[in-house]
């Protein structure tokens, strides 16, 4: 468990930024990483809120290699961050839920937007830590639209843009 408060994590981030160190809960910055059983028990008995983290065995020097079905072979640094698995309210984080859900739903291929590609190292680490088979990944480019008011490119919005909905094409007779 990690008992760090939001204020402590904020101070940690500020110190990392000031020292030009990769931000996040890792290595020597992960102050709850090596708490003794007695310390953990005392904090829980004192009612101190906590999250559950995965102690990452990753190293910045190591690389993760994977074949993306669209982008081809990709090399990225290993994840070194001790990712939160369960929030203090007991709700799993997106990343942990992604691994568990994909495993139990027998997902073999994950097809998603390229904005998620930076999460692959942490997802591979989570799948392996849980003993799950790592799915194949395919990262698609974002569908962009030129904003009529500004002329800028932006993501197609299912709330703002009617052509993002199937009904738009059905009504148009396509």
Pin down the residues of each PLM region.
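Active-site cores that bind ATP or allylic diphosphates and position pyrophosphate for catalysis
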Residues: 2-159, 163-171
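Conserved phosphate/anionic-ligand binding catalytic regions in large, soluble enzymes, centered on
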Residues: 174
